[in-house]
Amino acid sequence: MMAGFAQTTITKINQFYERWMPRLPAEMTARNVLVFCVVCLLCIGSVMVASASMPYAEYMHENPFHYVVRHAISIATAAIVAYLVYKVPLNVWFKNTFSFWLITILLLLAVLVIGTEVNGSRRWIRLAGFTLQPTEVAKVMMAIFTADYVVRRAKEVRTHWKGLVRLSGVMAITVGLIIAEPDLGATVVIVLMMVGIFFLAGAPPTQFAIMLGAVVMGIGFLILFEPYRLARAMSFTNPWADPLGTGYQLSNALMAFGRGEWFGTGLGHSVQKLSYLPEAHTDFMLAVLGEEFGFVGISIVIGLSFIMLACCIKIGHRALKHNFLRAGYLAYGISIIFLLQIIVNAGMNMGLMPTKGLTLPFISYGGTSLMMCAAMISLILRIDASTQEINPDREESNF
């Protein structure tokens, strides 16, 4: 029943495309629209990183362009990463999923040993003046692993408990290391992405319900038995109860939205970014954007993000339709990652969700996040280029 609902939803999205795309110019393919949205978001993000970070950079580094320069380097690096990822054939990714998973585990272990601790979390590895965040790499690698797994073990996934047990074991090892950092936000994204692919691959409703229930219980346990997480989870319901304590970030973010109204105060005229709103150029970039460009600016960014997401889903649906199962599930996994990051980041900025350290794709400052987002878009473009025609071969197990 649940798998049928998922397929019905995807079919509705595809029908929407088939109904409206013929009315648009031939150049407006899902691929071209996707690239257009990403470029627009990158441009908006670059402008907002400059606007939001300059006061903080001047205070911390005595150079207002400190984060602007680093962001420009990150964009250049992300472009190189995207090019290299695009050049790798899809079958190379899928034939080496276990090796990529082991590399991911080693990175997650390394960050616990040699990682840099910031605000009580050990999530970053310093490399030549820059930082690498292994959890961002884990999101992409686990999407590739899960997409391959549900095809390689298709019979087990759909008919036997072994499919659930094997995948749960891999999930437990991976998210266990991420929780140890700790990084609950990345944990939620990875777990829900894996559960989503498992569901779309046709898992029995009972297994899906058990897996989802275990995830919800696990997240609840992590929140309830860690005082700072519980305080953060509860503060979003009424940040004004403790505006100088647990509700400080959110109360300042809400004031930023309030000042922005419909059209904003103008580029560079944000008050909250002047040391009032912590992480203004990273997690709370949307609040600064709302203050400077108002509801209209927020609507444009969210609209572009969801159009980008719809293009990813469209490309994934066509891949499945043409019998490229691994590619299709990977596209859906990437779509789920983007969807969760957009919803959680926007939700926490607007006080609809607890505060979590998740960036807004292509908008927020963050080198590893930007590189991995570029890599995911590159994978989507590779899927689009590789699945234009119906797959003449039935996809088989890798081993």
Swiss-Prot record:
The lineage's top-level taxon is Bacteria
Q: Which pathway, per its entry?
A: Cell wall biogenesis; peptidoglycan biosynthesis
Q: Which Pfam families match?
A: FTSW_RODA_SPOVE
- Transmembrane stretches in the record are 33-53, 73-93, 98-118, 127-147, 160-180, 184-204, 208-228, 293-313, 328-348, 360-380
Grouped into one coarse class, the protein's main location is: membrane
Q: Matching InterPro entries, A to Z?
A: Cell_cycle_FtsW-rel_CS, FtsW, FtsW/RodA
Topology relative to the membrane: Multi-pass membrane protein
Q: Which residues lie on this side of the membrane: Cytoplasmic?
A: 1-32, 94-97, 148-159, 205-207, 314-327, 381-399
Q: Which family does it belong to?
A: Belongs to the SEDS family. FtsW subfamily.
* Known function: Peptidoglycan polymerase that is essential for cell division.
Q: What is this protein called?
A: Probable peptidoglycan glycosyltransferase FtsW
Originating species:
Acinetobacter baylyi (strain ATCC 33305 / BD413 / ADP1)
